[in-house]
Structure formats: structure tokens, C-alpha cells
Amino acid sequence: MLEIKVNNKSLSISFEGQDKLIFNVGDEIFAVGKGETNYSMNRGTFAIKEHIFEKHPLKIERFAKNDIILEKGKIILKIEDNNIHFIPEGLDGFNMMWFKLPSNKSEGFYGTGEIFTEFNLKGQKATIWVAEHINVKQTTIKMLNNLVGLKNLNFCRKFGAYESYYEQPTFISSNKYFYHSDATARSVFKFDKDQTIIQTDQIAPFWISYAEDFESLMTNLTDIVGRQPELPDWVYDGQILGIQGGTDIMMEKYNKVVAHNGKVNGIWIQDWEGRRVTAVGKQLFWNWEWDKELYPNLDKKIKELNKQGVKVLGYCNPFLAIEKPLYKEATAKGYCVKDKDGNDYLVKITTFPAAMVDLTNPDAYNWIKDIIKKNLIDFGLSGWMADFGEYLPTDSVLFSGENAEYIHNTWPALWAKVNREAVEESGKLGEIMFFTRAGYSGTPKQTLMMWNGDNHPDFSKDFGLPSIVPAMLSLTMCGCGLSHSDIGGYTSIMNLRRNMDVYKRWFEMNAFSPLMRGHEGLNPDINVQFDANDDILEFASKMSRIHAALKPYLKEAVAKNAKEGVGVVRPLFFYYDEKEAYNNGYEYLLGRDILVAPVMRPKATKRKVYLPDDEWIHLWSQQEYKGGTYVIDAPYGQIPVFVRKNAKSNVLEQLLKEI
């Protein structure tokens, strides 16, 4: 039970009879100030300069009922369900706020968004500002290093040098509490040795909650940020093939997989609305209408494939190609985000400019939603990639009149909401699945599935296959319990190209993930594809069958996420109170009973695996293991996967039938 206890000298937050957080008269743990933050955006990457003009520590003077009375203003505490809401009052005139929480050396911190390079954030400084995860400069330097033989797959920049598609002012402590802010402006978390310093660039309420276990803590958090609903039944029935290039190519590649007894539940054709070939690769024409020239008879093929149990998925984002008809309509109606001069604000993504639909304009919001209903859903698509959401410039002029600095972070959640409403208003929730890249608070209750963005097709720690595991785990810690990645990565250009080694290892990992979906990549012609030869066709087909065999198990885990907010991909420390479990970001639990340790090095045939204190059965050999660290054989097709001996599910039997 959560309680607030007050006397003349202190206010304490108590959980199950134990004091967890104590505020004393005279403490200076709050501060307010005035300042401004300047943002410069280049292709979704932000240079941020902070200017603090005033900062005033606020001493606690006294307590009145559940209120913390400060030198200026007060903080009102309200217990709402199992969480405590801290609501600042009387702090008008300030636009920055600081709050300090006590910490200790052994405490771990997790979350703050989708984090690709770290798992435990102790000692780090996290900036909460939605952006592109990988920028042009980083990729260019990497390609040059590869060219001159300086490839270093273990290289990582300082933590603060990385940005992320999904940011959220939320963290989970290993001491079984969470902090979550209602702020929409930038936040900064400093996880120091003896304290955690929280800065928000606005005066905003926040939440703290405690629980006996991490599952209950996630339920408390997702009571605030929301949860994803259960997935359509067809999603579990194998692999969604990533194909592009037209109707004939789509069917040819699909039939190859069928001939190898692959389990195909969908075909994702991102170029259904048209292809734009640029200097960086094969991209898309952002005009959300069927390209009949590239995909003749697609409407008929969709119906034929649906009869075979195969769905067809497309692509959509909140931009508009300025050369195409939908933009002409939008700009004529005043539906685009404006710049300070009143012109449509055109942003450059890679090599071309695009306009943005102003989602704060109710008419524009309904216009793009109706396009999704008519051109995607009514056309017959069973899902789509709902891309982007990170690019709203802070000097934009919005229809609502709101300051874009306070809307920038929430833009991807608003974009997810458009897509979610289109699905629900069409009566298709439970039949259609869209998946999003960018996110913020609000995304967990709007999206149907996350994906981990434009990863590099290699084993690099910061951008390649290894980065996927901490990314999925950190999303789970924010309440987004459904996520997956492009099989083989995406950003292929020049000497960044997908080879057979990384492709097979990515197939293995995604077979043991919530969703199995492929992607041809930015430059398909330089990448290995699933139909390159009979060997990879058979390998990919086998992995799809293994994934399909997980259907009952995954459905149960997804249902738990929908009901309780406990993600499908879970960190080991959820159930094992061991030091290594709190720091291991490169293994994960799929549901409660399966431990997965993807192979993360090129040409590796073994992998060192940490097993928490339990009884485990190695999937491929059925050999039993106790807790400990082992070097496990990992030939292609057999990444280290272990099933709990005392699993309540029959998942081991289901998998053994397939392997």
C-alpha cells in the first residue's frame, strides 16, 4: 500500500510500511529558473544550446496536509491508483525546474526512451529530445573508416553523442520505483553516483511509484502512459516478407519462399505508393495513393493473397512530396506546417525537401486520417509502416498557435494517434497492424507496434545488430512492450552492405522476437536478400517456421502486455535479483520462459552466455544447465536459446516439433 505520512518536520512516501522517500523541512531538492534553449536541425539531427539566465533553489519551509510548501509556490501530492502525482503550483514566471532524488552506487537506471548503446544508465546524462538516431556525419565517418581498414565494431561514442527516435521522460530504478514527467519540452536526467538530478524545460507535474516487483511496477507505469492492444492473429503465423519493385517481383519472390515451405503471413511493399531513386538509394514517393504503374493489378493480388492467409502491408508518413497531387491539395487548403514567413515549412530528409501535414489543425488532421482510411485501409492493406515523426522544427508556426518547442516531442505520439484512430474508426482494430519508429509519452497507448529504425547491416555495437537488444529492452522499460527490427538492417550504402553472416544472425534473433519482418534495405542491389540462393531461402524459411511455432506462447505474452503492461521482451532482472542481470543488456527474456542470447560477432561459432539462477534447457541439444556463465556452441540456425525447465507453458514441446 502506498501512503503519504506528514508531521511537522517531514513528509514521507511509504510503501508497504517502509519509508521510501523522505522530504525534510530545510531541504533544497527543488529549484526553478528562467532560460531558453536553441535548436538547430539538420536532417532530423539537432544541435542544442542551453542558456540558463536564473536558477533559484527552493527550500522546503513546511508541510500542509499532502502539500510541500516551498519558499516560492508548492508541490501538491496526490495518490492516484498506485502512483503519486506531484503537481507544482504557484511557480508562474519560471520555465525551468530541477528536482533531486537520492541514489547509491549500486543503483541501476533504465528507460528514458529507446537506447541503443547502453542498458544501465548509471553514470550517464540522458537528454530527452526526439530526433534521428543515426546522422549523416556518423555514417560517413564509419564508411571512411571501413574504406581505409579502420573498422571497429566495438566502437561507441560518448553516450551524449547519440540521439534517438523515441525519447520519454521516464526511468525505472533497480530499487523498484519509477519517475515519469508530464513535461513535453526537453528534459535532462543526470544519473550521478549519489543522486539523480532531473531537469525539465518547463514547470510540469511528475509521477513516482513503488512496487514489490518489476511486473507490478510496469503495470503502474502503463496505467499512466498506456498500453498496446493485442495483435491481430495473423501476425504470429510466420514472417512478413520485405519486398519492393512491383507486382511481378512481389509474387515471384513470395512464390520462392512458399516453394521452400516458408511460413509467410504478410508481404510488406513499402513502395506501393511509388519509388523515388535518389543519390543515397531507393526511397519512396510520399504521395499516399496506389502507384498503378509500378504495381498493376495490386488490388486483385491483395484479395488473392488474403485468401491464402497472406496479408499485404504498405507505408505512410506525415510528410508530403511537393511534386505530387496530395501536396497540391494540402497546400491549397492551408494544411501544412508553416515557417515564420507564412510559407509551407519544407524540411530536407535525405536529398529532397518535403512538406509536413499540420497535425494541430483539426481539418488537416482529419484530412490525412481520411486518406489513410480510404487509400490504405479501404484499398485492402492490412498494415503499414507509419514512419517518422521526429522532424518538427522548433521554429515552426503551428495552426494551434502552440510553441513548437513544446510540441516537437509529442509530434510522433500525435502521428501514431492519427493512425490508431483511422484503424479504430474503420472497425479494423484487431485486424490491422501498423508499426511506428518515433515516439514519446503517449505513444505506448496509441501505437500497435514499434520498430527499431534504420539500423546498419553489420555487427557494430552502436548501430548494428547488437544495438537492437538494448533498444528493445529500453522500450519495454518505457511501456512500449511490442518492438522488432528490420531483418538484416536498413542503412546500406557504399561499403555498408549486408552480407550472409549478419543476415542469418539477424534472422535467428528475429525468429525469437515479437514480430518477424524483413527489409531489402536502402540499396537492395548491394545487399544479400532472402532469395539470393537456395541456402538462404531454406534458412529463412526454417526461421519463419520456428517463429510460427511460437504463436501460442507469443500470444500469451502479448496478452499480458496488453493487460498488465509487461513487455514481451524483458530484461533478466525482472525475475533474477543478480548483479549481472542488472547490467546485461545483450541477452533478453522472450516472455517469462525463453532466454535469448543473439550472436553479435562476425563469423562467430560460439557465444558466452550468462544464465541466471534457475534450471535451463538448451533448445537445440536439450542439455540441462544451472545458473552460471557458459560458452555455448552457436552454429548458424542455433543461436543460444534456453527454456526454463519449470516453464508453465509447453513452449519447449512446440519448438521441438519444428526444429
Q: Model-flagged regions — what are they?
A:
Residues 303, 450-467, 554:
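Catalytic nucleotidyl-transfer cores of nucleotide-processing enzymes
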Residues 230-384, 388-401, 444:
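Aromatic-lined carbohydrate-binding/catalytic grooves of carbohydrate-active enzymes
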Residues 351-357, 399-408, 450-458, 535-540:
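Short beta-alpha connecting loops at secondary-structure transitions
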Residues 1-232, 242-243, 254-259, 631-653:
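Catalytic and substrate-binding clefts that recognize carbohydrates or anionic sugar/phosphate headgroups
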